[in-house]
Amino acid sequence: MKHMFKNILFHKKGKHDKNDAIKKAFSLFSVPSNENERIIKFWPLKFKEKDEETLYIIKLCDNMYSKKYVILVSHLISLLLMYSVCLIVGNINDLFSVLKLTYILLHTFTAINIILILTLHATHYVEMFKSIKGEIFIFYIMMIFVIWCSWLFILFNNIKDLLPIVVNVNNFLYATYANNKINIVLGFFAYLPIFYLITIIPCRICYSCAFDILFFIMKVAIFSVYYLITMKSYILTDNIFMIISALVGSLFIFVIRYIIEIQRRLSFHNWNKQTKQIIKLKKTLKEEKQKLSTTNIEEIYNLINDSIGNYYNENKKQKETDWSIVNNLEKILNILKEDNLFSPDLKTINKKNYNHIYGYIMDLKKQKEIINDKIGSKEEPEAESESECVDESKEGSQIESIFESISDVKQKKKSDLAYTSSYEEKENEILKYDFNMNMDKENISIDIWNTKFLDRKSPNYDAFIKIGYILLNKYYISNQNISVKILYSLLYEMKKGYNDVPYHNSIHAAMVTKHCSILITSLDTVNILKDNEMAAFLISALGHDIGHFGRTNMFLKNCSNFLRIIYNDKSILENYHCSYLFNILSKEEHNIFKKEDLKTLTNLRQLIIEVILATDMSKHIKILAQFRIKSIKIKSYIEKNIILCLKMIIKAADLSHNCVDWSEHYLWVKRLVNEFYSEGDDLLERGFELNPLFDRKAHNNFIQIQRTFLRELVLPLISSLKTLDTSTITQLMLSHVKRNYSKWTKIEKDETKKEKYLNELLTDVPNSWKIVYAPNLNIYKL
């Protein structure tokens, strides 16, 4: 039975295919026979997709609008010409005295048409037709039909007493006789609105059949009215014959127009399809160009996806599919031989003009070249850089390496978060702070993205404590019955830990924390975190740069700093910030988590460490690649990968000075470039070759570097975050980045502006920016 069913099914399918082939061979329409492939609904004639039908009408209207003056002039000339012909014919045959009502209607009809034409043109009729085209079309047809029938009955009523007794077929068509002198063409005047209707309103829409029906009714009305008037002297069969002839003629015209219109629509569909493909291709190319870099792991992911797509592609032949899959698998095997799966290909980087950007974010060490020996070997450092990059990429992809601070050596019953100091020390320490419990918090809104931290009379140094208090009190302190004094004590101690360096200071930390709060509430992550996890995340943001002394990881590696020895070249600064933060939290007078149990404290500590370590720019590409591969969109995926989402959020907030208004953005850039150049001056004194980012002498290229940074790092990061966005925050960020990028581009093209802005970046520098700070090693005292 089963086999019989299959045979019947395949037999029917074969028969269907055969019929389809015949239809395709003899079809006038040249459309697919498969119902799923058809793009046109044949009755009423329209595209199946509403968007395509709308676009078709818009294109028709736009085409008419571009020729509106030609249409206006041609219709006015045609109307006035027919009007003049009717007047001349009437005067020649002395018809004014006989056909008074007819000529009254002639003048009225002409005036109405002229007013209608001018009104439509004056009111931009094309734009109205785009939205209410169907209603206008039907209304206009009904109006014409009423006017035409009125014309017809008045005409025949005027001349019925003048009609000949014997009527032959040759004189039948309009039968507008006057004293048997001449056939007049007054009847043709009624067809003029139809001519106007075809050209001024797009009849090639789903209402076009109404025109053909009207045309047929007009012809039938002519013959029927004449028959009723001349019933005594005219044969009924002749009238029926003329009506049938009119019907056949109308159907023939309709079918021809119908076929032509289908072909036009198919041509439009092909054009529209190709246009969409070109736009999609351009968009894809643009997105690919804007990508930071395709890492090897992303390449593997894309190749596997491509292979799966080829396997399910029914249009491809089996051999082509097999070859494509095998080719992709060979590429994957070759990529897997590389060590740097989460890093961009170094060969690709070197081909680009912005390899110094990647050199910075990947901590690629530049040549250590002593001034006295400038012509030394230059190949060994390159090898060292490459090996260092490979070594960096060997880190596990699941969880970042967690380096315990030295304060963990002596562990008590609770972790360092719950470490208790003596009561006397606690009392003495608290007395050191002058708590302002009534601090003004109204002038900072935690919900507004564009807060002016720098673009004001003086920088907002109070923002750190104000923002920290508002957010931590909102999400945690108010629910845990913890003393506000402990919160203030923590915030004051953290603020005291920030040095007054140009960029990585407490104001930067306040901005990052505020933007983290906005992002986490605007993205689809806010309801996943518990109160204590939210507090830990905010503490991470507040302390992500604590103790920063205005130098980068690259500097610490080059100079063999003490911190490099402690943290083995792995995220040196970020581990230092973690240690500094936990050193503060280990004291009970600062510990807002002291009511949490040991297991919770361990989890919160791990969250803080992973979030702060994510701000290391050498991990930028890796984190972005992991996020892209996971394609986090569904809430269940977000819950499983919440740490990865938090890493992306703090990274976006850490670079958010690029996502604000130009005036604020420019001031942050000024601080950052001066901090970098200060490091470059220090490196130069020590005899190291400089990356262009830190070279004061390469300042003329700074704008190009800044544009590259925005395009290659910031834009891809924010664009990837859009998958989590449940509001419009990422769109706002992208618009600011693009505006700032455009502003830098315009400045670079104008030499006068370029020189002005470059000079402004390095002038009016406060003396406090020139102070050299050192890491606080007291946090490591046991």
UniProtKB/Swiss-Prot annotation:
Pathway named in the protein's UniProt entry: Purine metabolism; 3',5'-cyclic GMP degradation; GMP from 3',5'-cyclic GMP: step 1/1
Keywords: cGMP, Endoplasmic reticulum, Hydrolase, Membrane, Metal-binding, Transmembrane, Transmembrane helix
GO annotation, cellular component aspect: endoplasmic reticulum membrane
Segments on the Extracellular face: 91-97, 157-181, 230-239
Active site: H504 (proton donor)
Gene Ontology biological process terms in this record: cGMP catabolic process; signal transduction
Pfam families, per the entry: PDEase_I
UniProt: a divalent metal cation 2 binding residues: D545
Note on how the cofactor is bound: Binds 2 divalent metal cations per subunit. Site 1 may preferentially bind zinc ions, while site 2 has a preference for magnesium and/or manganese ions.
Biased segments, Acidic residues type: 381-390
Signal sequence interval, chain numbering: none
InterPro entries in UniProt: HD/PDEase_dom, PDEase, PDEase_catalytic_dom, PDEase_catalytic_dom_sf, PDEase_CS
MF annotations from Gene Ontology: 3',5'-cyclic-GMP phosphodiesterase activity; metal ion binding
Domain called PDEase: residue spans: 423-751
Reactions mediated catalytically: 3',5'-cyclic GMP + H2O = GMP + H(+)
Membrane-topology descriptor: Multi-pass membrane protein
Record: residues binding a nucleoside 3',5'-cyclic phosphate: H504, N505, S506, I507, H508, D545, D654, Q706
Cytoplasmic side: 1-69, 119-135, 203-208, 261-782
Similarity section: Belongs to the cyclic nucleotide phosphodiesterase family.
Full protein name: cGMP-specific 3',5'-cyclic phosphodiesterase gamma
Source taxonomy: Eukaryota, Sar, Alveolata, Apicomplexa, Aconoidasida
